[in-house]
Amino acid sequence: MSTTTHQTEFLSWKILPARLDAAQTAWYLGFEPHEIPMLIAANLLKPLGKPARNCTKYFATETLEQLRRDEKWLARASDAIAAYWRQRNARKRSAGGRNGDGSR
C-alpha cells in the first residue's frame, strides 16, 4: 500500500484512535510527516510520555483536535517550519561559500 493510499484511508476514518503516530499526526494537522520533528524541536508539539530519540512518537488525538482548530497555533507552526528551512538554506549557502547573489 502506498503512502497516499494509507493517508486516504486514514483520513476517511470516522472515529480516530486515542493516539496517533507521527505520519498520522502530520496528515491530521495538514503537514508533511517530515515536518513533525521540526514542530517537536520548536516545542509546538509534545509527544506522549518520554520516548527515546529513536522511538516511535505518539500524540494524543484530543490535543491534536484542539491544535487543529487553533488558527494562531497553525500560523506559529507554519512559521516554525519556514524558519527551519530558512536557517538550513542559509547554512548550506554559507558552507558552500556562496554569496546571497549566487556568486562565489
PLM segments and residue spans:
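A detector of low-complexity, intrinsically disordered, Ser/Thr/Gly/Pro/Ala-rich segments
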Residues: 1-2, 54
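Polyanion-binding surface elements
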Residues: 2-39
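Short helix-start
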Residues: 18-23, 40-75
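Intrinsically disordered, low-complexity N-terminal regions enriched in serine/proline/glycine
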Residues: 27, 57-58, 83
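A short, Lys/Arg-enriched interface patch at domain edges and termini
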Residues: 61-104
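Compositionally biased, low-complexity repeat tracts
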Residues: 26, 45, 96-98
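Intrinsically disordered, low-complexity, compositionally biased regions/tails
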Residues: 34, 53, 100-104
